[in-house]
Amino acid sequence: MTEREPIFLTDDVPLHPDYPLPDLKDPVMRPFWEGARQGKLLLQRERRTHRLHWPPKPLYWQEAPLEWFEASGKGRVFSYVIAYEPFLPAFQHLLPLPLAIVETEEGARLVTYLVRCRPEDVYFGMPVQVVFKRLTSEVVLPVWAPAESTLQGMRG
């Protein structure tokens, strides 16, 4: 559970028509995207052992009953690279873009990008906090910001 109000960011730049949007109807990922829309980072685990499953499995997975739970929203930069060329035209306005693998406090490693920080300020092990970027009225993307700026009451 998070102990603070979620932070929602909006972009001043209109969403590029080629921006890849997730399939919100995908039955495996639907709870993740619904949670993000509510400002919650949801992860999946086994109900009995609390063993984390990321990426998530279908709920009918045979080995053990699964459940979604609200993660702390805190993590550290496990790995990163700075993109100076857009991998899609939709990301041109974000360059240079710090792409990262964030390891959450719970142990999930999420591929993401970092916001509210300069590329030269990113480092391995950097504490980060999830923030939510509103892409459309239906799609909200969990992204990550340095924990220091998040804790200072940053609002975007």
Cite the ranges covered by each PLM segment.
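Cys/His-rich short segments
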Residues: E34-K74
